[in-house]
Amino acid sequence: EVCEMIYNSKRIILIGSDEMASYFSRMQIDFYVMGRLVVKNSIYKTNFFTPEKDDCVILLSMEGRIVDLNPWLLDKMKENNPKMITIGHYDYLQDAYGLTIPQGLDEVLENMILDYYIQEITYYYAENYL
């Protein structure tokens, strides 16, 4: 389902804190090689751009602090009704597709699960949508 959302989108927009966004680097490169436009968006108002309807936004936030500290962010992300995917402990966007990472695990395990999700999305897309 995630790959279908990505396939049917004009752009893939990755949003996460600076620490979490580093996990997107390999995914961004892999999808670029597959001919897809992948953009990392900022969580800061001065640099943020509003996703369009035909975009797919992937929001990575383990604890949800990115949303708690930036209450304007969700409204701006959802403004044009793009496809939305969240990755983290909470599915704080009820109308988004959520990939949940269990809370209370060791940080190493959390990172392994996150890496697994990103690899699965990338490899499944390469195998089934190219």
Where are these regions (language model features)?
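Glycine-rich phosphate-binding loops that contact phosphosugars or nucleotide phosphates
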Residues: 7-130
